[in-house]
Amino acid sequence: SEQQALTELKDIASHNVVKRSLIGQGYYGTITPSVILRNVFENPAWYTSYTPYQAEISQGRLEALFNYQTLITELTGLPVANASLLDEGTAAAEAMLLAHSQSKKKDFIVDDKIFPQTLEVLQTRARPLGINIVKIDFDGSIPMAFFADAFGVIVQLPNSHGNLRHRDGVLRLAEVYKCMKIAIVDPLAQVLMQPVGEMGFDVAVGSMQR
């Protein structure tokens, strides 16, 4: 029966050993204060406060999107923000395509410590367009020749090792060779670190999922 099958599956699953990941790879546990939980996430007024008609959507949702975009511009130090994409990987791919549309070059430089799930999306989107993904260790010496044929560079902050480092050398080379500078940044990290817009990045992407 279905109940017997569920019981057996639960028994099998109970043998799994769940260990804590201290790296995260972009997925970090956070605490949501109860005041935010009650007044924002659990408050139906944000999405039903005006009208259910599709033509006008809802004033609450529009206000929430406006507040979100305003917050992102303040955190990143960049002049504009969109109303979000599907996930971090998709946003990174869209940023790559934005940079590609501004140049006839074919190489795209990627931080070798980028999150693996983001790299997979970049490679999938790059393949049909003939874009070459060039992975570089930004912690070592960076050959200038790599930037000569590149239309953009993407940096992960913090990276897959949990390191948060300024990439002044990378940004200077990108500026010299007119490469679009893209940062994949944790929005919560932007509360404590210098805004990526002030660092010199042209575009910022990240994930608000927790």
Please report, for each region that a protein language model flagged, where it lies by residue:
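Short loop-beta-helix segment that forms the pyridoxal 5′-phosphate
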Residues: 20, 53-57, 61, 73-93
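Electropositive phosphate-/nucleotide-binding environments in soluble metabolic enzymes
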Residues: 2-6, 59-66, 86-89, 116, ...
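Acidic-glycine-rich active-site phosphate/pyrophosphate-binding loop
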Residues: 60-73, 197-202
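Glycine- and acidic
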Residues: 51-55, 77-82, 104-109, 154-156
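Conserved PLP-enzyme active-site core in the AAT-like
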Residues: 90-210
